[in-house]
């Protein structure tokens, strides 16, 4: 094939999913001339599985991405259909924001952002090879012969490398949602000396919402919480948000699965690759948890301009006929019509023990990797890695020191540290239990932890930085007010209404919080902090309520940091 130069660039990003988009934007926004290669322009920022952003621990990642100057939180807020705060009945450390998003709008808004970003060129094409010289990356060759000379390459191919989809006996060499797969880059990775293995994930069927009966199901409305992005101040009212619905599998659902395990690819030998432990198929759940009479399902809208409904919790690779029978056993789905059948997908990924904490490969300088090719699962984990890979590539290109976030600084630090020091034998999912300093790594203080770092690296815009400084000052003012004295008579009446004895003289608002009085009650009774955003107020409340635990956690983090730096 005749090759030709496509022009010289600072960096090439291979893949335009959630990792690739963040990587390309981080590079371009910090002044690096960047190309992003995608197999299909219509798959930029595509959500091949769940139509949502955030969730337990994942919401923390999105807020951290945003605090550093990334795009996922901004785009999620633009396209959100519904917000909810998960684990509200638990402690502040594990509460996580989640949003249902409009899948098509998420793609189009992300594509628009890329198209209007200075220093960034988008090209549709498949990366065929990585060029190197003397142990350093020098460029990328495409399947059509175009050559992109560059000094940094970020591989963010998601689940597309040698992908194949499986639905019963029907096996297709394809990427998610029928998109073309990438067939050439695995050979380049093997040639460069990297290990490649096979992982597997899956997705549920999409239903025609007109054939779903929600009248007898439990509605899950949206909530008036705070947005993902620190650039935004508010979210739509509950009444303007789109509801989801709760339903369950039953004994008949389970019988169909158990009676047909010989036709289930996961159990008849068709699929042998490793799947995600924390997002199992319905077949796996029914077999592994045989004592459970039912499994929870959520019916989630795919968008405002489509009738498609995503059935969270009913991922499967059963044959088409069994899928139809199985779905119709579920309450509310008795007459449902499937518009997209469920499937499992197998794909190539690397061993992250071959990767440095900067997400640069060990053997080839300037070659980075991010996202599901690193053995992770989830849009948020991918976006976090993409941001860090792009930012570190940019810092290297600009002759600056790399950014390696510690485990006590960010969930992103926990994610990357786990990957490059422990590796993973299954699709890795971020969870709050993985973060030993989770009480200090809350989603409400992500900007305090990371925005200054992002600004110093050149990624946080001046607009975002000024807003951060204003919020920081507001936090300090709020903390000072809460340290001031409350009206004694009103304070006594309040604590007695909570079944507590009267207070001694000179009580402060902070004293009331330490006694378990919610800040929202203080705002209502005393009329304080009327204009302070909810997340700022709650952040200050958490710092007071868990003051002793936070002090201990920060002391432990300092001790661990000293041990790591001691020769």
Where in this protein do the model-derived segments appear?
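Beta1/beta-strand and adjacent pyrophosphate-binding region of the FAD-binding site
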Residues: 4-19
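Conserved N-terminal/central alpha/beta ligand/cofactor-binding core
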Residues: 7-8, 23-129, 144, 152, ...
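Active-site-proximal substrate-binding core of FAD-dependent oxidoreductases
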Residues: 43, 203, 360-363, 394-427
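Internal hydrophobic alpha-helix adjacent to the cofactor/substrate pocket in enzyme cavities
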Residues: 65, 382-405
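Conserved beta-strand-loop-beta-strand element in the redox core of flavoprotein oxidoreductases
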Residues: 131-147
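Flavin-binding catalytic cores
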Residues: 187-197, 252-271, 300, 314-344, ...
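A glycine-rich dinucleotide-binding beta-alpha-beta segment and adjacent secondary-structure elements
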Residues: 310-376, 404-417, 533-567
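Extended, charge-enriched "interface" segments that sit outside catalytic cores
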Residues: 434, 440-442, 446, 451-567
